[in-house]
A protein has these predicted regions:
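Interfacial segments of alpha-helical transmembrane regions
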Residues: 48-77
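Generic beta-strand or strand-like secondary-structure segments
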Residues: 67, 71, 79-83, 122, ...
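Membrane-embedded catalytic cores of phosphoryl/pyrophosphoryl-handling enzymes
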Residues: 100-137
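Hydrophobic, aromatic-rich transmembrane alpha-helices
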Residues: 43-53, 122-128
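N-terminal transmembrane-helix/juxtamembrane module of multi-pass inner/ER membrane proteins
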Residues: 1-43, 77-108
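Hydrophobic transmembrane-helix microenvironments that flank and shape a buried ionizable site
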Residues: 33, 71-74, 113, 117
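Membrane-helix interface segments
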Residues: 26, 56-62, 132-137
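Short alpha-helical linear motifs
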Residues: 53-55, 72, 86-92, 119
Length: 137
């Protein structure tokens, strides 16, 4: 079996095992909360307020660069990597669709990489580097 076919089958086996044997209701609720964009508003507001308070001459640049970082990460993950990798979301993959515990709608056709993860990782990296520069460490 070719490596990528083996990896695809392993991915499907792990997904099916998690969906059918390891589903936990309280964890479902926690994950739904964490994936909700409004959950993160307090963090974003805190960072913005902190920047205006501690780095006011650079605050506008910080906000503009934050928006650029978000847009870049979202574009690369959704428009470049997802079509390039072509990993179907489980709800569209006939091999595992019957195992999907549909807690939310299905979304776009492809699922890898996660745009949520790419966007948050991009923001976290930019903020870490920028804030470190602002506080001089």
């Amino acid at each position: 079996m070719e490596f990528f076919a083996w990896l695809d089958q392993l991915d499907k086996n792990i997904f099916t095992a998690i969906q059918e044997q390891l589903g936990v209701e309280w964890l479902d609720s926690a994950m739904l909360l964490l994936r909700n964009a409004t959950t993160w508003i307090p963090l974003y507001l805190f960072v913005l307020i902190w920047i205006f308070k501690n780095a006011s001459p650079h605050a506008v640049s910080f906000i503009v660069l934050t928006i650029i970082t978000f847009a870049f990460c979202d574009f690369v993950s959704a428009s470049v990597l997802k079509p390039l990798v072509g990993r179907l979301r489980p709800c569209y993959d006939t091999d595992v669709a019957s195992s999907v515990r549909g807690l939310i709608g299905c979304g776009g056709r492809f699922s890898f990489p996660s745009s949520h993860a790419a966007n948050h990782f991009g923001l976290a990296t930019f903020w870490f580097l920028a804030i470190r520069h602002v506080i001089g460490k």
